[in-house]
Swiss-Prot record:
Record bears the keyword Transport: no
InterPro entries to which the protein is assigned, alphabetical: Cell_div_SepF, Cell_div_SepF/SepF-rel, SepF-like_sf
Stretches for region Disordered: 150-191
Organism: Prochlorococcus marinus (strain MIT 9312)
Keyword Membrane listed: no
Identification of the protein by name: Cell division protein SepF
GO biological process: division septum assembly; FtsZ-dependent cytokinesis
Pfam families in alphabetical order: SepF
Annotated family: Belongs to the SepF family.
Alphabetical list of Gene3D superfamilies matching this protein: SepF-like protein (3.30.110.150)
High-level lineage: Bacteria, Bacillati, Cyanobacteriota, Cyanophyceae, Synechococcales
Superkingdom of the organism of origin: Bacteria
Regions of compositional bias (Polar residues) in chain numbering: 165-177
Subcellular location: Cytoplasm
Length: 191
């Protein structure tokens, strides 16, 4: 049927689509029963295959084993990378995405490329809510969010120990309290 003849049939109100429908085949009750029996057989065979042969010993007792917090069944993996160019950085990001800790030794790279690499990995680490830590000169630790990173010296980990290069540094030698605002503390109003 062409487009023009269909349009004419629609305007005239003819039953123009009767020829295009196929009869739907509905499953009979016997076929539905056969399908359900097959599914039940599959479930039973899967349950038997997955069952533990030692389950008969544990039927009468309840398990009192409690997992320790912070310890997972999967082993943690650390990836040590010593890249020579920036082209190797996507491998470090992939390792972080696979929930592996990455130690990046950038001593073999040009300083400009190393800075670019650290910025790239730091961005990827931030995107997955991970942690980053400078371990040594040109050595960095990047960890996914599932790994807690702690520092043995609190001074290194504190954000106050890191300051911009152009900011003047102030040190306070005297730890005594400042003088009160009303004047000399040695003088009293009643003397």
């Amino acid at each position: 049927m062409s487009l023009i003849s269909r349009l004419k049939a629609v305007v005239a109100g003819d039953e123009y689509l009767d020829d295009d429908f196929d009869e739907l085949d509905y499953a009979t009750e016997d076929e539905l029963n056969d399908i359900n029996d097959f599914k039940q057989t599959q479930r039973n065979s899967n349950a038997l295959a997955n069952s533990n042969p030692f389950d008969f010993m544990n039927n009468n007792r309840s398990s009192k084993v409690v997992g320790m917090p912070g310890i997972s069944n999967s082993s943690s993996e650390v990836s040590l990378m010593e890249p020579r160019s920036f082209d190797e950085m996507p491998q470090a990001i992939q390792a972080l995405r696979e929930r592996k800790t990455v130690i990046l030794n950038l001593t073999m790279m040009d300083p400009d490329q190393a800075q670019r690499a650290v910025d790239f990995i730091a961005g990827g680490t931030y995107a997955i809510d991970g942690h980053q830590e400078r371990v040594g000169e040109s050595i960095f630790l990047f960890a996914p969010s599932c790994v807690n990173v702690t520092s043995s010296s609190p001074e290194e980990a504190s954000p106050s120990s890191v300051s911009p290069k152009n900011t003047p540094q102030y040190s306070v030698e005297n730890n005594t309290a400042p003088e009160p605002a009303w004047g000399n503390s040695k003088l009293s109003a009643f003397s």
